Amino acid sequence: MSAPTHTHSPLYLGLMSGTSADGIDAALVRFDDASHRRCELVAGITVGWEPQLREALVALGQGAEQMAIDRLGRLDAQVGLAFADAANQLIAEAGVAREQIRAIGSHGQTIRHRPQADPAFTWQIGDASRIAEHTGITTAADFRRRDVAAGGQGAPLMPAFHLAMLGASDEDRAVLNLGGIGNLTLIPRDGAVLGFDTGPANALLDSWCQQHRGTPFDADGAFAASGKVDAALLHALLADPWFALPPPKSTGREQFHLAWALQAMGTATLRPADVQATLLELTAATVADALLRHQPTTRRVLVCGGGVRNPVLLARLAARLPGVVVESSARHGLDPDYLEAMGFAWLAAELLAGRPANLPSVTGAAGPRLLGAIYPA
């Protein structure tokens, strides 16, 4: 756990669980002033899901289960309680008083994201009323749906936070989150910020590794490193028309899952390690292609999310981006493991300050909007 510091400024607590559903990230954050342009990670923890609950979330997230309303209602309550427990655990371990925390910002757990549907919708579960009730702290949640209601994708939401914390006046930058799904924030020295999903990242890699190695993720990319990229499979995967769509665009497990990869594989018989290497190359290729297509002047890519701990993936990405510095967001003072949770603490702070937090240039929304709903303590 990151060590806490102590001042009198209010704290915000961010809660995040991504498409990989590999745990709940909880981050205590302090902002420098009312503008919320600089922040400090006071403390952070990751709390694993109870195995049966994680199994249900993964199945629901990739569309494998059409869940009865009663079961979905219970799952919503269970996820809310798990988020509350993670917040309470962080507060206890950090040794801070609840009165110091002005609000919790909870992302929830995405179970469906259908921005192309008619009508478009996105759905995150994790009952925020229960978080407020069981922590005694005002909770902000449901950040994506207002952007969707305004004609946007509802994702990604982190580019506004990335711009506030990591923008630079002397170079064109990108922030790359390698979670279950990869997403890029393109931050030019001048001009509009662009942000969008790039396609599958850890979600496919983790699922294949779990199926063939019995481990939840590919530690240090060793499984992928032991295989060779299959050019035919990579070509088939890259042929998916989603990759050619222009921004704004977003996606999730419901589109990119193992059944999708197996369909591309067809009747070919491949070594599991070769498939893992190919899935890793798919992530590197789609990220690099998107970056070169939409901001070829990028000089620095700041990486966060679980993929930052995969040196094989980072090496392949760097090989596809000659002349571009690829480095962890930690080099710029932001812990890559908690950057998204910190971002949802920031979204809570912006909502309470009455400031819009979406970027229409990123999501395609009709205009700036206040994001989220407030559940009082």
From Swiss-Prot:
The keyword Translocase does not apply. It comes from the Bacteria. One of its GO terms (biological process) is 1,6-anhydro-N-acetyl-beta-muramic acid catabolic process. Keywords: ATP-binding, Carbohydrate metabolism, Kinase, Nucleotide-binding, Transferase. ATP binds at residues 18-25. It holds the Pfam family AnmK. Its EC number is 2.7.1.170. Pathway: Amino-sugar metabolism; 1,6-anhydro-N-acetylmuramate degradation; Cell wall biogenesis; peptidoglycan recycling. SUPFAM superfamilies: Actin-like ATPase domain. It catalyses: 1,6-anhydro-N-acetyl-beta-muramate + ATP + H2O = N-acetyl-D-muramate 6-phosphate + ADP + H(+). It is an enzyme of class 2 (transferase). PANTHER family: ANHYDRO-N-ACETYLMURAMIC ACID KINASE (PTHR30605:SF0). Catalyzes the specific phosphorylation of 1,6-anhydro-N-acetylmuramic acid (anhMurNAc) with the simultaneous cleavage of the 1,6-anhydro ring, generating MurNAc-6-P. Is required for the utilization of anhMurNAc either imported from the medium or derived from its own cell wall murein, and thus plays a role in cell wall recycling. Belongs to the anhydro-N-acetylmuramic acid kinase family. HAMAP family: AnhMurNAc_kinase. NCBIfam families: PRK09585.1-3, PRK09585.3-2. This is Anhydro-N-acetylmuramic acid kinase. It comes from Xanthomonas campestris pv. campestris (strain ATCC 33913 / DSM 3586 / NCPPB 528 / LMG 568 / P 25). The gene is anmK.
